[in-house]
A protein has these predicted regions:
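Conserved mid-core segment of classical short-chain dehydrogenase/reductases
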Residues: 96-111, 130, 134, 155-158, ...
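Canonical Rossmann dinucleotide-binding motif of NAD(H)/NADP(H)-dependent dehydrogenases/reductases
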Residues: 2-34
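Active-site loop immediately N-terminal to the catalytic Tyr-X3-Lys motif
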Residues: 102-103, 151-157, 179, 211, ...
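Residue(s) in the substrate-gating loop at a strand-loop-helix junction
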Residues: 146
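Alpha-helical segment proximal to the catalytic Tyr-Lys
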Residues: 130, 175-179, 232
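C-terminal helical subdomain
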Residues: 186, 202-234, 239-243, 268-287
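Active-site helix of classical SDR
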Residues: 125, 162, 170
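Catalytic Tyr-X3-Lys loop
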Residues: 103-122, 142, 159, 166, ...
Length: 287
């Protein structure tokens, strides 16, 4: 059964990791998908893979900086122009963001982190909701948050604070958009084997009930449920896909502290741009 037959979806951060896996899954379930990313090389590579699977008639790509309002407006317009409407938005684009001690983080890098991690969620929702309000069946907005946004000690400061904002945004937007049958939900991944966490995956073994690292398909399957009509009565929630990691917050903080200690994160400062194609700049702090 194709669970998204004839629905139209926009997915940001679609060139790799969770976004790529979700785009492929949505296409396999009958959706028309606009894939957005700021990494031109990996975006085109992903579209080539879609062509190989003979799914390209239901897909198109859009080079997008999710922190730029005009780019988001263009992205949503593309979905409507190509496929007639917009039913699903998956705000998934992200970066590691500014890292380092609070006393040394660069303010511009802090702002840039929030632009990509949080402002993008607002912008995507703003323009998607304008279209979804016209739909008889409303729509589904799905936002990638993180377990780092649920408490202290489980991620870099800027990243964690921005993801906490994503979770709260979902709750408030769900209340506002509910009367229009627009559902707004978040997914908080735990340790997922993606390009953004590749180093951590190699260096760590987290203490959690399900003793394994998650895969992008685990998040994609959750997004598929939230995008489908099966979740028609669910809004404003945050689903943790983390192998039970957050069930023991003390263990989570201990594991995170050990991981960041191994990375020497308290001794470096800079900006982790993830898989955007923009070089990360991280420097050692002077003693």
């Amino acid at each position: 059964m194709k669970r998204l037959q004839n629905k139209v979806a926009v997915i940001t951060g679609a060139a790799s990791g969770i976004g790529k896996e979700t785009a492929l899954l949505f296409l396999e379930h009958g959706a028309n998908v606009v894939l957005a990313d700021m990494n031109k090389i990996t975006l085109e590579e992903t579209f080539e893979l879609i062509k190989q699977k003979n799914l390209d008639q239901n897909a198109c790509i859009c080079l997008t900086d999710v922190s730029v309002e005009r780019d988001i407006e263009t992205l949503v317009d593309m979905a409507v122009d190509q496929f007639g409407t917009l039913d699903i938005l998956f705000n998934n684009a992200g970066i590691g963001g500014a890292i380092g001690p609070i006393t040394h983080i660069n303010a511009d890098e802090w702002d840039r982190s929030f632009q990509i991690l949080l402002k993008s969620v607002f912008l995507g929702s703003k323009y998607a909701a304008r279209v979804m309000k016209k739909n008889v069946t409303g729509g589904s907005i799905i936002n990638t948050a993180s377990i780092a946004g649920m408490g202290g000690g489980s991620g870099p400061l800027a990243y964690s604070a921005a993801k906490a904002g994503v979770i709260n945004f979902c709750k408030n937007a769900a209340i506002e958009l509910g009367p229009d049958k627009i559902r707004v939900n978040a997914i908080s991944p735990g340790a997922i084997n993606t390009p953004l966490l590749a180093t951590a995956i190699e260096d760590s073994k987290l203490d959690q009930p399900i003793e394994d690292f998650g895969m992008p398909i685990d998040i994609a399957n959750t997004a598929l449920f939230l995008a489908s009509d099966e979740s028609r009565f669910i809004t404003g929630i945050n689903i943790c896909v983390d192998g039970g990691l957050t069930l023991d917050q003390s263990g989570l903080m201990k594991d995170a502290a050990e991981h960041y200690s191994k990375m020497g994160i308290e001794r470096v400062v800079g900006m982790n741009m993830g898989s955007t194609g923009i070089e990360s700049v991280i420097e050692n702090l002077e003693e």
